[in-house]
């Protein structure tokens, strides 16, 4: 099966439909009772999440307890936890003492802090995330290593230390910023993204209705372009949001976070994320059929070379 055939096979109807988000929801008077008793994390939840994380890390790295700190962070541990989303978001952020990591894992001596974080995140994303996509039946629990070892540097809504069983950034009553210029900009995102989804839908319909090779190839080319554009817009919005929660960003009140959250509320982000996944899966399927394996990107190859040469 060629690339275009793989792309069409991975594609399915996509809609842009509004959904509830915590960012634009009213603050609750208390924290999520599925996780907290008063303002203390339920002990069994804390131990379970730490167990999931460290069991995974021990399978790949030596002595992770010596250099790893873990927090629950974001809307899931804030007063804005009650948006009607299924599953609800729950983020476990991981800090690494990189010098201690290198001492315990000598094959990573030549790695930068960013390369170590990327390596661990690759493993977390492919191996641990699928196990925790419906944690406790209600949460999408994700694990992510930040290059910054101190979580306060990324300005989270709130952060609870799983390691120390205490708050590092206590939750506050917050509400989304109001800014007419920002509203105009996100409306432009929605118009652009909806146009991409419309072209995607038309191309998919044209492929199914095509009666000759030329018509099918034209429709497949249009589908490929729409998927590429959707994936690129998703990456642009997502990377901006990542910068919002960095040392130089403004966190909750950053425009890039507002842009991301507005896209989630309008349904644009889920639609673009689906297009990004279609792009990735069709490429991987084509590579697997052509080369017998999925080809790693250049950054992964460099990290592997560094590891094996140390």
Q: Model segments located where?
A:
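Catalytic core of pol beta-like nucleotidyltransferases
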Residues: 11-87, 95-310
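Extended acidic low-complexity intrinsically disordered regions
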Residues: 2-11
């Amino acid at each position: 099966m060629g690339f275009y055939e793989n792309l069409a096979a991975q594609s399915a109807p996509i809609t842009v439909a509004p959904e509830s988000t915590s960012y634009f929801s009213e603050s609750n008077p208390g924290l999520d009772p599925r996780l907290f008793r008063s303002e203390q994390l339920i002990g069994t939840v804390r131990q379970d999440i730490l167990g999931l994380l460290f069991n995974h890390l021990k399978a790949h790295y030596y002595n992770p307890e010596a250099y790893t700190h873990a927090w629950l962070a974001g809307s899931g541990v804030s007063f804005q936890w009650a948006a009607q989303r299924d599953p609800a978001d729950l983020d476990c952020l991981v800090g690494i003492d990189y010098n201690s990591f290198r001492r315990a894992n000598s094959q990573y001596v030549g790695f930068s802090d960013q390369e170590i974080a990327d390596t661990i995140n690759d493993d977390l994303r492919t191996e641990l995330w699928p196990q925790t996509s419906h944690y406790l039946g209600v949460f999408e629990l994700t694990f992510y290593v930040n290059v910054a070892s101190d979580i306060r540097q990324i300005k989270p809504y709130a952060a609870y230390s799983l390691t120390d069983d205490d708050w590092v950034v206590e939750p506050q009553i917050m509400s989304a910023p109001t800014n007419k210029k920002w509203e105009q900009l996100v409306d432009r995102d929605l118009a652009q993204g909806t146009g991409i989804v419309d072209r995607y839908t038309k191309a998919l319909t044209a492929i199914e209705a095509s009666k000759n090779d030329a018509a099918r190839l034209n429709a497949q080319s249009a589908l490929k372009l729409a998927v590429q554009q959707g994936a690129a817009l998703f990456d642009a919005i997502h990377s901006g949001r990542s910068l919002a929660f960095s040392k130089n960003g403004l966190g909750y009140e950053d425009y890039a976070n507002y842009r991301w959250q507005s896209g989630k509320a309008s349904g644009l982000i889920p639609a673009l994320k689906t297009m990004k996944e279609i792009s990735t899966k069709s490429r991987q399927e084509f590579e697997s059929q052509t080369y017998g394996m999925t080809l790693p990107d250049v950054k992964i190859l460099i990290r592997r070379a560094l590891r094996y040469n140390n």
